[in-house]
């Protein structure tokens, strides 16, 4: 994955990423893929806790910011401060805002301006890119 110009605090070689991640996690997080909607075990997670990056362990979102968007992917209205960064994604003939981990640069999903108030953001995140730790 070389679409991000900066170096991240956590880096691994491609071989190390392949060893650390499952094939599906690698495809989503390192090759900018998308998991099938409705297939994520974290989609219906309602316990209080924290969602973290599978690639590096950085906390990304809390369950207090999660909401049901009806899209089939875990959705949040705000990330933890400094946890994610965004870039413009021009793939598939669309212009979207990609969300990636600010610590390791792994692709997480996209953010859209159609979420609930007050932020009106919908961070649509691939569940395979996250771990959940109950509070």
Describe each region flagged by the PLM.
Residues 4, 8-135:
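A short Gly-Trp-Pro
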């Amino acid at each position: 994955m070389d679409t991000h110009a900066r170096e991240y605090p956590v880096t691994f070689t491609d071989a190390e990423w392949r060893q650390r991640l499952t094939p599906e996690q690698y495809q989503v997080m390192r090759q900018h893929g998308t998991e099938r909607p409705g297939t994520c075990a974290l989609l219906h997670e309602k316990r209080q806790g924290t969602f973290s990056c599978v690639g590096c362990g950085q906390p990304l979102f809390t369950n207090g910011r999660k909401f049901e968007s009806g899209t089939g992917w875990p959705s949040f209205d705000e990330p933890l401060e400094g946890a994610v960064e965004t870039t413009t994604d021009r793939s598939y003939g669309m212009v979207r805002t990609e969300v990636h981990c600010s610590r390791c640069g792994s692709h997480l999903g996209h953010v859209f301006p159609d979420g609930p108030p007050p932020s009106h953001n919908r961070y649509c995140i691939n569940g395979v890119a996250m771990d959940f730790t109950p509070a």
